[in-house]
Amino acid sequence: MTVVGDVAPIPRRNSSTCSNDIAAPLLPECHGDEVAHDEFNGASFSGAVFNLATTIIGAGIMALPATMKILGLGLGITMIVVMAFLTDASIEFLLRFSKAGKNRSYGGLMGGSFGNPGRILLQVAVLVNNIGVLIVYMIIIGDVLAGKTEDGIHHFGVLEGWFGHHWWNGRAAILLITTLGVFAPLACFKRIDSLKFTSALSVALAVVFLIITAGISIMKLISGGVAMPRLLPDVTDLTSFWNLFTVVPVLVTAFICHYNVHSIQNELEDPSQIRPVVRSALMLCSSVYIMTSIFGFLLFGDDTLDDVLANFDTDLGIPFGSILNDAVRVSYALHLMLVFPIVFYPLRINIDGLLFPSARSLSTSNVRFGCLTAGLISVIFLGANFIPSIWDAFQFTGATAAVCLGFIFPASIILKDRHDKATNRDTTLAIFMIVLAVLSNAIAIYSDAYALFKKNAPRE
């Protein structure tokens, strides 16, 4: 997503004229110039779908089977489908009003509707959300590959289990190697389309996890080792009723990808294809989410943990169970490594917009580009390694920033209706989105605060 200023639509590639008011960083000032320099003819449809799908499928996929445990398969799958439709509607709001206002960025659209404060608010939300997400990704990668010690109990990482404890497979060493060997090179691309192959591999790794989970579930189902799952929630008292709402934040934030939509559209060979791209990505991710939820819950039932990855740290009770456990954990760690650059891309753009709002395109300054990239990666690395309470902090700020990006900001643009384009249906849907987002955020903050106080309360 680009956020600095509004820009005129890019002319057709064969045109000899260029717009002079393009100020969005990392966007070519003229497609003709861009082609002349490096033969970039626009992003493909499939590449755009994979980039958007990778933006969506991050760490949240592992929390979905636990939502089935609370909601039951029938209601849980219905909620996933509903959230996919709401996400599609909110992105459609952004694209329709961007076209009306001739904006080619989310920030430009917010600036057009709410002035400079709106643009800055959007940039801060992306900053908080994406830094938090990337630090959490790095923490998870460290936990999976190097292990962790919690409450005096050491949980072995995959590499530690394979090779024993050595300096090179310790947490700090693994994260340093990953940062220098994977994150830094992938973060150096100036176009989001350059990440299409790593994004495709990232989606493929998520599918590998799904295939392994499905295979184990089917094997155990045939052998009679799996009970039929509940289709509806088990509500027996008021506490179990209120417990249903604790999964709302997980579902509401499951499809957040809005901060990358404009960047992907701007690089498309045919920008009008962005709506089919969005719908294809949402259909792909919905299918992966639904199948993961079904087979994850089918496999572990009421023993499904909040993070189903933790269930693969136990004995599966099947031949080659330990090998399959390691395959799931390694594929997931590799998946997160490849998600990292697609989430990092809009983070760098927004930091540049906050620090240098009137500067030329970030792609024209290698020094600024390099310094921002190195600085942000360093902050994320240090946060994941040396700030033990940072996960708790981002549980609060992350929930707030994510629902703002996905629902509150798009709905607010509709309610502002600067171009008189909103219908009664749009207004009703926008109000519903805001109510849902506020409810989700309140539940998430209450649940996280309650869990934190309970965790830190002195034991009797």
Swiss-Prot record:
Record-annotated membrane-spanning stretches: 45-65, 66-86, 120-140, 172-192, 199-219, 238-258, 281-301, 336-356, 371-391, 394-414, 427-447
Keyword entries, A-Z: Amino-acid transport, Membrane, Transmembrane, Transmembrane helix, Transport
Coiled-coil boundaries: none
Recorded topology in the membrane: Multi-pass membrane protein
Cystine pairings recorded for this chain: none
Chief subcellular location: membrane
Gene Ontology biological-process annotations: amino acid transport
Location of the protein in the cell: Membrane
Keyword ATP-binding tagged: no
Assigned GO CC terms: organelle membrane; plant-type vacuole
Family: Belongs to the amino acid/polyamine transporter 2 family. Amino acid/auxin permease (AAAP) (TC 2.A.18.6) subfamily.
Listed name of the protein: Amino acid transporter AVT6A
Species of origin: Arabidopsis thaliana (Mouse-ear cress)
Lineage: Eukaryota, Viridiplantae, Streptophyta, Embryophyta, Tracheophyta
